[in-house]
Amino acid sequence: MFLLTQMDVYMSKKFFKLNNTTKTLGKIFPALLICTPAVAFSAIIDQSTSVPQDFSADAEYVINQDVTISSADSEAAVSVSGFKVNNATNNGNISGTGNGLNINTGVQSVVINNGIGATISSTTANAVNIKSLRGDFNNSGSIIGAENGMFVSKGSSALNITNTSNGMIKGKTGLSTQAGIGINNYGSIIGTNGDAITADYGNTKVINSCTVQGTDNGISSKDTANLDILNSGTISGETNAIMFASSEINTLLLDTGSTLIGDVISTNSKGNTLTLIGTGTEDSNFIGLNEGDGFASVTMNGESWALSGNIDIIGSGDSLLVETGALTLAGDVSNTGNTRVAKDASLQLGDGEKTATLSGGLTNNGTVIFNQGSDFTFATDMTGSGNVEKVDSNTLTLTGKNSYTGDTVLHGGTTLVSTGATLGVKGSNATVTVKNGATFATAGEVNNNIAVLSGGTLAAWNAVQGNSTLSASGVDTINGNVTNGGTLLLSAADNSVGNNFTINGDYTGSDGSQIVMNSTLGEDNSPTDHLTITGSSFGQSGVSITNIGGAGAQTINGMEIVSIGGSSEAQLTLAKPVVAGAWEYNLYQHSDGNWYLESKATPSDDPSDDTDDGGNTDDGGNTDNGGNTDDGGNTDDGGNTDNGGNTDDGGNTDNGGNTDNGGNTDNGGNTDNGGNTDNGGNTDNGGNTDNGGNTDNGGNTDNGGNNAPEVMAPEVGAYLGNYLAAQGMFLHKRDDRDQITFRNEDDLNTWMYVKGRYHENDAGGDKVSYDTTTTVLQVGSDFMSKPMDNGILRAGGMFGAGQAKTHSDAKHNVRDAQGKVDGFNVGLYATWQEDQKLRLGSYVDTWAAYSWYNNKVTSNRNDEDYDSEGFAASVEVGHAWVIQSENERTWKIEPQAQVIYSYLDQENHTDRDGVRVTTLDNDSVFGRLGVKASYFQQKDVKAWQPYVAVNWLKGAGQNDLALNDETVSNDTPEDRGQLELGVTGNLNETTTISLRASGEWGENSYAAYGGHILLNHRW
């Protein structure tokens, strides 16, 4: 603490100087006053001056309140230097035209104080310029510099800067250090035209509990700085909150009260880390500047944190660690390593509004919670001993190998285990609990027990809206016990019939539970959903049957809907009457323990073990009187085989009650009139095989099912034409927008083109044909021209609009249909050209565009509207050279190659008749390989240039659509040939016009013809 001794001073021409007597008294008298043997060498300044001051001779200096020391020239107003000074305090004002305060002390420990209300300022340089300081700098006042508020050179060491709650440090850069120091900020550090704090070298530690604010970055590290930040205050930057750009390891520790305004960027170092303690929320991104950049690790050691921004984690091993507390992530988290959740800790993905993504592995020994804001596919493999919960109402699709051994609780929404995915370990006793409002379905491998609570649903895969019927192994299979207190839903959402749900374990139903199925009510072998229980059944459940197109028929043994491998103790009852026309069906349990739908008032006898009156075994439950074995459960006395319980005219009695008129095999309760095989409840009138419920009147094979329709709806062609037109509407090459024959280095190009295209094609296996006419207007302009060491780079923007009209006809159908697409797009392009003047040498052209479309399909059946949107990007290369010739004109040859990626997302559409139109894939890749030959005048390159181009077009794009799961292709050939003829010339000194005609040809009667007009204006 400074001793406040009054000293006399006198003015010289340049400095305040203390006389020798005053100096001696100032050094000795305070010690005498406090009765100690110590001697304090101190100087107190109590008068203002415009003369720069040098603090070097005494141990302590104090500038009193209301005292101003200023300097009008480049010399610092106050300089603290030498090896004697131990303490200097400013309670007044230090103002310099150059630096305000210069500090250059020795190896001794020095304390510099800027008191409450005190000011240190500079109008042209640094307010505080520290060349060398070992010790502490405490600021409770204002430090305001034109350049830096405070600047610390490399010569400083073991320096700690404390900015108290009353302190403010401000400059273009608030505080800049080239040495490793400590910064404790309880006040404000402000960068008015740059960073608030920047560290270039050394190990710097920043503890911020108040405000750090920059117009560029809040805090940044550069060069070889090692920057450690502990933040419980606010760090903000108009560009980024924090920029870690040094090559050394930087750390960020966020504590309770932390607020970041702007992102945290990591680059150049692979070892930067983020740690969370206490509680808090952040919406900033913690990401890398370039691909491969990011944070080596993110560690949660706090109580509760929510991060809603994106995070790039580039470490290996356990690089995302949740050691304690609850961590919520609601952005895209890219993790090249593994995520580990410790016991008693939790990781939540999504915050109920935003959806999080997480890549890498996941070891869960605590709890993982899904609370996503939208439908979400989770591909990360989950291991460990922890539990998983889903609390949102959206759809979660698991596609990974999930071998965690804990329990799973589903509070809401839909959870899907997709084909190839795994949930649980074989032999595990873990349980998936499906609560009220939640649905669970699997097409993969589920090795857990399932507990369906009241209001919950265990569903077949295709019972979930949007899922298609799958035939892969493991679909609709549970390898564990099922306890059903809610609904076991087997009926497909699309009203199809034939699901087979398998429980490789026991089934227990409780009061109020239901099993819901679809059936086509008919004879014994009619299609139906089916439940297979390989274990035993207990309890009770209601069975709800929905008839799908069944006309009803008399059953013999019944339609089996539930089979049980073990003890069959469950009581199943119909939840509602089951009626098909005049036929009513009951649910009976046979002696084999299985359950059957039967159109009978009483159940059938045991169908597998009946008595034959002739002392023979009869497998069909019939009496046979001739002592012979009949495979359908009947005895045929005339030596004929009769498989269906029928009377055979060879003189044998068969109790199946059917007539068979002559040496024929008849498999079940049918009339067969002549030497034909009839396999199921059909009338067959002459020499034909009929396998499934159809009437066949002559010479044809009818297998009970339909192939692709012989007569196709013309709307199919309209949908196909619309999709193909939208996919290709705005795809273009460089020559479509730039045909300038001569160009100066600084010329920019404004352009516009109009193109028309007529395209016709057979599709759907030649069952539908359509033609499409497309017109496109595209406008754009360069906004940048940058000469390079080799060539020139130009870039620009573009926008456009287009319309496509399709007319579709179908064979054997008098109707037709029309399609229409109105499209719009915006995009950017860039071109590097080796020789811009004559467009010689190599070039690279790229563009990217976003497009959106309004689509219509009209016919005499329906008018349909639907939307789509897409993105496309292109890379094109070429190289042009001139064939040397002595003639006035010669040829310029230009081989070209182009690859285009197209993404078109068409909303799934269901028309008014229930026809569902869906796309199978959204991604397409197109290729072009060709050569262009231009015939130009050597002495006047601006003269008109005719040209010809030949191209090989590769890729048909995504040209398949599914209509009610029936895939139809537009049959666009994968390989097509293209011929272009055109001419380019100047309308005036700055305007060029290009005219082109083109044709394309390929398989499947594919043909396309087009015209193109381009105007280029250079300026």
What is each model feature region?
Residues F2-L4, K13, D46, P52, ...:
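Outer-membrane translocation/initiation segment of Type V secreted surface proteins
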Residues F41-Q47, A59-E75, T89-G98, N113-T124, ...:
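Beta-strand-rich solenoid/repeat architectures in extracellular/passenger domains
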Residues S50-E60, E75-F83, N99-G106, A125-S132, ...:
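Glycine-rich beta-solenoid repeat tracts in large extracellular/virion proteins
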Residues S70, N93, N700-S885, A997-S998, ...:
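Outer membrane beta-barrel translocator domains of Type V secretion systems
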Residues L230, I235, T239, N268-G352, ...:
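Extracellular beta-solenoid/beta-roll
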Residues N744, S785-D789, E834-L838, W881-N887, ...:
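Outer-membrane beta-barrel strand-turn architecture
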Residues T750-G756, A795-Q803, V844-W852, A897-Y903, ...:
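Transmembrane beta-barrel strands of outer-membrane/channel proteins
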Residues P787, F824-G827, R912, R916-W1019:
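Outer membrane beta-barrel transmembrane domains
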